[in-house]
Each structure stands twice: as C-alpha cells, then as structure tokens.
Amino acid sequence: MVKLVFARHGESEWNKANLFTGWADVDLSEKGTQQAIDAGKLIKEAGIEFDLAFTSVLKRAIKTTNLALEAADQLWVPVEKSWRLNERHYGGLTGLNKAEAAAEFGDEQVHIWRRSYDTLPPEMAKDHEHSAHTDRRYAHLDDSVIPDAENLKVTLERALPFWEDKIAPALKDGKNVFVGAHGNSIRALVKHIKQLSDDEIMDVEIPNFPPLVFELDENLNIVKEYYLEA
C-alpha cells in the first residue's frame, strides 16, 4: 500500500484579495505560509514518509511544498517541478477581482467560466503582463502548447501525461508521493484517480488546507481517502 498526498498551496495574496490567479506567479500570504507549515506538521504527526515530491513551477506551490516538507522533517526528499502541475490558466480573467468580473460579465457567465468542465474563459492577450509566452520558465516549450485560457478539461489533458509518466510509475514502484499543486490541477487529477464524471467533479472543492491523502493498492485502486486532521 502506498500513500499519495495532495497539498493545495496555502492561501495566496490573490486568494486573499479574491482575484483570479491562474498562471500568475503570486506569493503566499502570511496565512498561506502558516497553512503550509501546518500541513507539514500534520504529515509528521501522521507518520507519513515520502520518497519523492512533485510541484508546479509557480512559487506558491513550490513554497508550500518546501515548507510542508521542512515541517515534516523531510526537506531532503527530491522534488521535481513541472508546468504540467500549474493551476488552470484563467485567461483574460487573470488579475480580475471575482466580484468585479461578475458585475462586468454577469454572475451566471462568470459561474459558467469558473465551474463548467469544458467552457473556456476569454483568452489572455499575448501582450498581457502575465502572459506565459514571454516567461523564461516556459522557454523550453513549443509556443503552441502554452495556453491562453483553460477549462478543467484542458487542465486534465495537460496534467495527465505527467501523472502517467512520473507520478503513477513512482506509486506503482511502491513509493510514497507528495504533490504540492493547485486547486484545479489537483481536481483534475482527482477526477482521473476516482474516475469521476464531468458533472461529479464540479462539486469537488480542494481546500488550501489540510492535505488530502489517498491510500492506494499496487494497481492504484483507492483503498482509503481522507483529509489529515490534527
């Protein structure tokens, strides 16, 4: 039996301000920093020992991963970063206050953009200050694969190869894995792991804290699923 632990990053400065974040590289808030540390303490108390860890290339997830592993006294655990674990790209909504977006586009439209499985938000302009096309961390990627907007369906399509190439093989090899990522990239992987329908995943929320644990058998069937508690 192996353990897969998902930790959504702690509260970010833009979470706190109620802004659409997506691929914008926003830092943790003071509360978010503490949530990451507390996540690590829960992991230590639960006696979970990791063999490797994965995170995105966005600082809020990277810092959460490092802080949690440090608090769990496992900072030595190898960490691999991948853009495939990034948050869903919110396109032209990035940086907008969610309440202001609702006032501008209407509550129903914004709700559809946020919660529909396969409806895309407006695309981000190539010259937007948060465009990934000019960001050095994505320079190794073909420009055609860098998104300008994503829904959960596209987020899953982007994250799934990383699951199949990196995470799943490690679990099948008997390794315990920590994944420090984002609300929607985790939701996408949870949809795959639990084989949820497009409608079922819409009701799934991943909190900033505490971490979510899956205990899996050798075929990666779920034996147990739970959130860590103090």
Swiss-Prot record:
GO biological process: gluconeogenesis; glycolytic process
Record-annotated active site: H9, E87
Marked site (Transition state stabilizer) residue numbers: H182
Sample GO molecular function, one term: phosphoglycerate mutase activity
Record Pfam families: His_Phos_1
SUPFAM superfamilies: Phosphoglycerate mutase-like
InterPro entries reported in the protein's UniProt record: His_Pase_superF_clade-1, His_PPase_superfam, Phosphogly_mut1
Protein EC: 5.4.2.11
Pathway: Carbohydrate degradation; glycolysis; pyruvate from D-glyceraldehyde 3-phosphate: step 3/5
SMART domains membership: PGAM
Name of the top EC class for this enzyme: isomerase
Binding site for substrate: 8-15, 21-22, 60, 87-90, 98, 114-115, 183-184
Substrates-to-products reaction catalysed: (2R)-2-phosphoglycerate = (2R)-3-phosphoglycerate
Claim: Isomerase is one of the keywords in the record: yes
Record flagged with keyword Zinc: no
Keywords: Gluconeogenesis, Glycolysis, Isomerase
Family of this protein: Belongs to the phosphoglycerate mutase family. BPG-dependent PGAM subfamily.
Function as written in the Swiss-Prot or TrEMBL entry: Catalyzes the interconversion of 2-phosphoglycerate and 3-phosphoglycerate.
PANTHER family: PHOSPHOGLYCERATE MUTASE
Protein name, per record: 2,3-bisphosphoglycerate-dependent phosphoglycerate mutase
